[in-house]
Amino acid sequence: MLENRLYKRSDFWKLFSRKYKLTKTIEHMMIDSIDIQENDRILEIGIGNGTVFKSITKKLKKGSLKSIDPSKRKVRQISRANRKNMGNGEVFHGYPEDIPFDDRTFNKVFSLHTVQSCTDIRLALREIYRVLQIDGRFYISIDTNTGEKEKTYIQLLKDQHFRDLSVIRRASCLCIVAVK
């Protein structure tokens, strides 16, 4: 009985470890892809646990990072946790389908898994297109690199008038980069 519980527990930790490594791979891939410059104006859609937020705000000197998340609780939690280290970053409550910023505010927008889970992805992509400056870049990460999902997102981005689409693959995840 004890061996059975230990076996189940070790399976859990193996799965957790694999998921954690994949998450870190995706986060590093996104940060590398964005190529953060000190004066960038960046929008993060979905703050997650705040690790990418912290990494980016450390690199920005004159620029800014704004993050929106649909969870009010998460916005409060991340704001409190990073109160001293916010630097050039701010966290707001908001949805990808209704981004609370003016047209052409950001030169870079990125999403780690959040846009995929929104209720109307076409509306979310339209909003992202609206807040991006001309020649601004949108970065979206996708968990699996299945061809069907990749083709679907590329077509959705093309339908919203994004151009110069490129795909960056690493491990079992990919990042699609699109230009306004």
From Swiss-Prot:
Check the record and name the CDD domains matching this protein.
AdoMet_MTases
Top-rank EC class of the record's enzyme: transferase
* MF-aspect GO terms: methyltransferase activity; S-adenosylmethionine-dependent methyltransferase activity
Keywords from UniProt, A to Z, are: Methyltransferase, Stress response, Transferase
What switches on its expression? By the natural cationic antimicrobial peptide LL-37 and the synthetic cationic antimicrobial peptide poly-L-lysine (PLL).
Q: Which GO terms describe its biological process?
A: methylation
Q: Note the SUPFAM superfamilies from the entry.
A: S-adenosyl-L-methionine-dependent methyltransferases
Protein EC: 2.1.1.-
Q: Which domain of life is it from?
A: Bacteria
Family named by the database record: Belongs to the methyltransferase superfamily.
Q: Know the name of this protein?
A: Putative methyltransferase YrhH
